[in-house]
Regions:
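Charged regulatory segments coupled to nucleotide-binding catalytic modules in large multidomain enzymes
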Residues: 1, 190, 194, 226-228, ...
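Acidic ATP/Mg2+-coordinating residue in the GHKL
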Residues: 64
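A short glycine-centered beta->alpha linker in the GHKL/HATPase_c
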Residues: 68-70
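Bergerat-fold GHKL ATPase/HATPase_c domain
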Residues: 1-48, 52-55, 72-75, 426-429, ...
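Bergerat-fold ATP-binding/catalytic subdomain of histidine kinases
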Residues: 76-91
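GHKL-type ATPase core
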Residues: 87-208, 213-219
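Short beta-strand element(s) in the Bergerat
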Residues: 56-60, 162
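Short hinge/gating elements
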Residues: 13-24, 150, 165-187, 276-278, ...
């Protein structure tokens, strides 16, 4: 019997589709987290994230000590929509994360892997957007072992594992002004945000709460400490009885576990520092609500999923909601694992389950909270190792610089805040959202033409 089809295969244009897939909504922190997911699936127990600032030659590297991949496995992993079977504990879903997350931040993605410490064989390939633009082919480039360079070769000298290297960081630093203090401070700020994000998203792995998956993550050599959104080490924490809800969706049956917590108010925390630490990256009001976990990995931090609105009087209420990847379709998980919807057929049960925690949180706040007092200085949560500042290095090795003991913002004002019109326009374009850029481009073009050759500064 012939397997021939009368259909017409229409292969998408690589350069058009790959450009579009760069805009799925990843920021730097979420993109790094997606690569960490892959490392966890590969059985890694240690993951090192290194960031080097060196202008156009800046790079970001994620290295793990997992089992590594043979050349054929690596080529398949580099494929958009990689074919593989996922089990109930896998963090992956679509076979897109490695590529879409990485190329949302850079123009050149290189991946190298080693499976046997006793053999020198290293498989390495790269996606290069410049090459795709020229050839318009779905074509990865093989990287010869002799030309890998120290950023890729050094971590795999004596161990199994995988190295993911981002170069040509156009979405991180921008093309026009990738040098100088402004670019360095921007990367420093991103490192701080990534540290907070990873400490929160993977806190169950970092604390050893996920069976057989105890994890250590280093950011520029500094160990990331887990941030527990429920302050379970505080003696005055109130942990309500967990609720398990059975869910059936399109023939798939699973369980959704709900664990409600009421955090202590300010005066009942063990210390002022512990209270500030518990406020979270988004601070108290925005951190109330659901913390949704998929296979132990957090995919939502705070918010009530349209069951109720956030309220100052309920800011002490936090609820862990956990499910396995078998229920992904029911929760409508997106590619970037940054959006989730509560299934309509159990929304009423979830609302009933959280009603007690909301009432107790309101009573705790109304009865015991002191009058609000001004906070002396901002504190970023979660606390961890010293801020891993990226710095320029002629030796092409990551350099770690620690801040002073007292907190200071990741980005400090320069002594002269003036900049050229070109620099000003470039900065505006860098922070604009994709749908804003066409309008901003027209405005900045008109601004430059009006300033003309006067070389104005702003």
């Amino acid at each position: 019997m012939s397997n021939q089809s009368n259909g017409h295969e229409l292969i998408p244009s690589p350069k058009r589709l790959m450009k579009s897939l760069r805009d799925l909504g990843y920021d730097f922190s979420a993109a790094v987290a997606d690569i960490v997911d892959n490392s966890i699936e590969a059985g890694a127990t240690s993951i090192a994230i290194d960031v080097e600032f060196d202008g156009d030659d800046s790079w970001v590297r994620i290295t793990d000590n997992g089992k590594g991949m043979e050349p054929a496995q690596l080529r398949e992993a580099m494929r958009y929509g990689a074919e593989r079977d996922y089990d109930d504990e896998d963090l992956g879903r679509f076979g897109l994360g490695l590529k879409t997350a990485s190329l949302s931040q850079c123009q050149r993605l290189s991946v190298a892997s080693r499976t046997n410490p006793d053999r020198a064989n290293i498989a390495a390939y790269c996606w290069d957007m410049e090459h795709i633009e020229k050839t318009n082919k779905w074509e990865i480039l093989p990287l010869e072992r002799t030309g890998l360079g120290p950023a890729i070769h050094n971590p795999l000298k004596e161990a199994t594992g995988t190295v993911v290297l981002w170069q040509k960081l156009d979405r991180i630093l921008g093309f026009k002004h990738p040098y100088g203090e402004f670019a360095r401070k921007k990367l420093t700020s991103m490192c701080r945000e990534a540290e907070e994000h990873l400490a929160m998203v993977f806190h169950r792995f970092l604390a050893g709460e996920v069976p057989r998956r105890k994890l250590k993550i280093l950011l520029n050599g500094n160990s990331i400490k887990p941030w527990d959104p429920f302050s379970r080490d505080e003696p005055k924490i109130k942990e309500l009885t967990p609720v398990v809800i059975k869910l059936e969706h399109e023939g798939v049956t699973g369980s959704v576990k709900i664990e409600p917590f009421v955090l202590p108010n300010q005066k009942n925390y063990s210390s002022a520092e512990a209270f500030k630490r518990a406020s979270g990256p988004a601070k108290w009001n925005r951190q109330q609500g659901f913390y949704i976990y998929r296979a132990g990995r957090m995919i939502q931090s705070g918010g009530w999923c349209r069951l109720r609105t956030s309220d100052e009087h309920t800011k002490l209420a936090r609820v862990a909601l956990s499910f396995l990847p078998a229920l992904d379709e029911a929760f409508k998980i997106n590619v970037a694992k940054m959006q989730v919807q509560l299934p309509a057929n159990i929304r009423d049960q979830i609302e009933k389950a959280i009603d007690p925690v909301v009432k107790i949180a309101r009573k705790t706040y109304d009865k015991e909270s002191p009058a609000p007092a001004p906070v002396a200085s901002p504190v970023t949560s979660p606390p961890s190792a010293p801020v891993p500042y990226p710095k320029a290095s002629n030796a092409r090795q990551p350099v770690v610089s620690s801040p002073p003991a007292s907190y200071r913002p990741a980005v400090e004002p320069a002594s002269d805040n003036r900049c050229t019109i070109d620099e000003f326009c470039s900065r505006i374009e860098e922070i604009a959202k994709p749908d804003e850029r066409p309008v901003i481009a027209r405005v900045t073009k008109r601004l430059k033409s009006q300033v003309g050759s006067r070389g104005g500064r702003t």
